[in-house]
């Protein structure tokens, strides 16, 4: 880039300034008026001509009302260059933050508040993953990544004195983008889909502050699965009593909460499906993807919309800003979506440590082994650099080590899948031109670095394939940290990809992925024990089973009034076993003034229609009942826990199958009922009484969507897209917060010249070579 612009590279270290607290990330720009005039210039106009060094001939960018860009060029070089320029103009702050996060360098931008997170990311060492991924990428794709990077850098150079406000207010000068940075972001994306690290650390913290007997009740696997009592009992008692490890566990949990808040590539939960021509009322195949809102509504969604058009490449869909491939989209012949499979290919091991003659050692196979060491330098905004050692055991990097001045104790090591010859980046690139389900199915089997549900559809066929790499575990489910010195819980290589779940053109006519459990207990491959709440998947299956499916099924509708699976499960719980008798006994214990009201509320709940939409009043009462259960069931125990544990437990309940719902659906013998209200029946009646006061105005849409992609092969313009949050992360952009009339509206993303002009009109931003 020095040769391209004739300038020295940006400094690796920001100027010294006061440390910027974490709250800056979520703050508004009030108080930053000094930056406003220049920062506002960081927004690229929608029309006009921009001359840039690096573009060969010309390219055009057009945007619809939601800011979804159409990028047109007569050649692939300028298309990729302009894609880099466009994504940087929309998402530079996100791209820079994610690169620094993956590198373990956020303290350079935000100060000492990020130092613990930087330590964690340096230990995990995603930079090595990115380098390996890039090394295994074909030379032609490496050149494409370099072209894309030059487009990013053209924006960086153009706006070098008028960067977006969050970067401008810290005087941070981002380094130029490198081709390897795209591989680094894909490595961060892969890591974010690959395990339950935060859940395992949460489990250890809960066991340390409560006890191992309560732990399985708080971290259930699935409604029909037994609690992981045996796994919890494998955590050694002496480990739980170690105060130094307890303190370091809390610190690590706090850091992981920080990671979750900052990592926009932590894939959102999503509901997706493909339907065959025989299944749909239109008589054509279709693909639908609805990602759920993971970020606050005012923040942009994790993915960025793109519509690419050149003689060599036509594709439209969702992309990670910084990586010139699609995570979901349509290339003119093939539609595909990649969503979270809730994989668990990471495990935490408790290592027994000691300091011996100036070196750190860990216990393995009844012998003390030296820990591997490497040195890392951390640059901190406003402070002097620090240089620290990072240690690893045979399992992997130590995320916590011995306390200062301690000669022995425990640490936590992270083991995760390591792939030396992975070509996942090339697989994603090849999907952009794959012409059929048959060819794409063969291709995605090589997607080893990215664990995912991949759904495929062409005009005649549909398919589903699970991807990734999964360890074979001895005597463990990977739910809770295991003692590293115990060889009986070690990994034994990786699962055979032949065991990965897949299907093609099933007789039922549809395939779906909604983060649900994909394999039954006892299956020869352990994908995970950390599935999401099955409600979305079960409700979708109920709808898809009704043939033929109308096109309206794919629309991003409010589902808060249609909850057939949950209502059925709760009504069965209330009507089976000893629950009816227990409820009658609990009713008799209520004061007479409440007894009639509780009886009426119970009967109203039993009368809720599972197969029909709820009224506004019914939906509000159901939501109130669920919210009351969630808030009160574990309140006594949670209130006594450190804030970091409470926050982590709340995050876990949002992302995975939650304990409060598991208790409502069953677990009548749980000790938590006694703590909460004396009995489950009494707790349910109290919750019914509370919900009976709910107003119909209190009902809120469930779930909250983030982005929706619809591909209907029966339509002249197959692709439609909707955004529920902004396309840009620049607060001065008109596309950072979408107007109400635009939010959730479906916009076509055409791929032919005739349709393009109809949809986008003739206004363009034209990119030309500099004079």
Question: What residues fall within each predicted segment?
Answer:
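Stable alpha-helical elements in mature extracytoplasmic
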Residues: 102, 126, 141-144, 148-151, ...
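Substrate-recognition/specificity elements adjacent to catalytic centers across diverse enzyme folds
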Residues: 34-286, 291-298, 306, 310, ...
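Second-shell loop/turn segments in exported
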Residues: 79-82, 129-143, 413-415, 425-431, ...
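Glycine- and hydrophobic-rich flexible loops that cap the catalytic core of alpha/beta enzyme folds
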Residues: 310-321, 325, 329-334, 338-488
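Hydrophobic alpha-helical segments
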Residues: 346, 410, 449-543
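N-terminal secretory signal peptides that target proteins for export/translocation
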Residues: 1-13
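Terminal end segments
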Residues: 526, 530-580, 633, 637-771
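C-terminal motif of bacterial Sec signal peptides marking the signal peptidase cleavage site
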Residues: 28-31
């Amino acid at each position: 880039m020095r040769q391209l612009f004739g300038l020295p590279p940006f400094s690796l270290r920001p100027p010294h300034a006061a440390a910027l607290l974490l709250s800056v990330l979520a703050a508004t720009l009030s108080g930053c008026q000094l930056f406003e005039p220049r920062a506002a210039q960081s927004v690229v106009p929608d029309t006009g001509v921009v001359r840039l060094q690096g573009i060969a001939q010309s390219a055009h960018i057009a945007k619809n009302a939601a800011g979804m860009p159409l990028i047109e060029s007569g050649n692939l070089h300028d298309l990729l260059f302009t894609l880099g320029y466009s994504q940087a103009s929309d998402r530079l702050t996100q791209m820079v933050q994610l690169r620094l996060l993956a590198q373990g360098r956020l303290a350079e931008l935000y100060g000492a508040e990020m130092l613990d997170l930087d330590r964690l990311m340096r230990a995990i060492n995603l930079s090595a993953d990115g380098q390996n991924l890039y090394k295994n990428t074909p030379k032609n794709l490496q050149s494409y990544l370099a072209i894309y990077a030059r487009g990013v850098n053209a924006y960086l150079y153009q706006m070098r004195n008028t960067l977006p406000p969050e970067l401008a207010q810290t005087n941070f000068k981002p380094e130029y983008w490198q081709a390897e940075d795209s591989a680094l972001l894909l490595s961060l994306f892969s890591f974010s889909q690959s395990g339950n690290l935060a859940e395992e650390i949460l489990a250890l913290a809960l066991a340390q502050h409560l006890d191992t007997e309560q732990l399985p009740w708080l971290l259930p696997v699935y409604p029909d699965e037994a609690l992981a009592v045996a796994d919890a009992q494998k955590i050694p008692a002496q480990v739980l009593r170690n105060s130094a490890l307890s303190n370091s566990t809390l610190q690590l949990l706090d850091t992981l909460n920080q990671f979750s808040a900052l990592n926009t590539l932590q894939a959102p939960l999503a509901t997706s499906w493909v339907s065959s021509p025989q299944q749909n009322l239109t008589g054509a195949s279709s693909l639908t993807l609805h990602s759920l809102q993971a970020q606050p509504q005012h923040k942009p969604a994790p993915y960025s919309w793109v519509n690419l058009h050149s003689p060599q490449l036509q594709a439209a869909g969702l992309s990670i800003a910084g990586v010139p491939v699609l995570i979901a989209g349509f290339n003119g012949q093939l539609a595909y979506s990649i969503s979270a499979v809730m994989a668990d290919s990471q495990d935490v091991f408790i290592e027994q440590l000691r300091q011996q003659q100036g070196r750190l050692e860990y216990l393995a196979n009844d012998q003390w082994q030296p820990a591997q060491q490497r040195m890392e330098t951390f640059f901190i905004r406003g402070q002097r650099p620090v240089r620290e050692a990072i240690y690893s055991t045979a399992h992997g990097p130590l995320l916590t080590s011995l306390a200062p001045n301690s000669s022995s104790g425990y640490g936590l090591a992270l083991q995760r899948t390591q792939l030396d010859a992975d070509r996942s980046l090339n697989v994603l690139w090849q999907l952009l031109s794959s012409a059929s389900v048959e060819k794409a199915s063969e291709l995605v089997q090589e997607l080893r670095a990215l664990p995912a549900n991949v759904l495929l559809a062409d005009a005649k066929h549909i398919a589903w394939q699970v991807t990734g790499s999964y360890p074979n575990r001895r005597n463990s489910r990977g739910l809770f940290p295991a003692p590293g010195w115990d060889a009986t819980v070690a990994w034994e290589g990786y699962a055979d990809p032949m065991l990965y779940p897949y299907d093609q053109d099933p007789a039922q006519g549809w395939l779906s992925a909604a983060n649900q459990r994909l394999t039954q207990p006892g299956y020869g491959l352990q994908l995970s024990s950390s599935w999401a709440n099955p409600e979305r998947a079960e409700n979708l299956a109920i709808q898809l089973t009704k043939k033929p499916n109308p096109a309206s099924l794919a629309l991003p509708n409010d589902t808060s009034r249609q909850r057939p699976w949950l209502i059925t499960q709760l009504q069965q719980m209330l009507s089976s076993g000893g629950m009816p008798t227990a409820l009658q006994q609990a009713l008799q214990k209520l004061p007479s003034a409440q007894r009639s009201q509780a009886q009426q509320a119970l009967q109203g709940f039993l009368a809720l229609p599972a197969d029909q939409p709820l009224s506004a009043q019914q939906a509000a009462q159901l939501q109130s009942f669920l919210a009351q259960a969630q808030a009160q069931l574990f309140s006594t125990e949670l209130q006594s826990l450190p804030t970091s544990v409470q926050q982590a437990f709340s995050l876990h309940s949002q992302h995975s199958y939650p304990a409060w719902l598991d208790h409502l659906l069953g677990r009548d013998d749980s000790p938590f009922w006694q703590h909460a209200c004396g009995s489950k029946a009494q707790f349910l009646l109290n919750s019914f009484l509370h919900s009976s006061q709910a107003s119909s105005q209190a009902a809120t849409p469930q779930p909250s969507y983030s982005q929706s992609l619809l591909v209907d092969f029966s339509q002249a313009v197959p692709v439609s897209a909707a955004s529920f949050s902004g396309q840009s992360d620049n607060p001065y952009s008109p596309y950072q917060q979408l107007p109400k009339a635009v939010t959730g509206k479906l916009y076509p993303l055409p791929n032919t010249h005739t349709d393009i002009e109809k949809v986008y009109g003739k206004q363009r931003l034209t990119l030309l070579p500099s004079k």
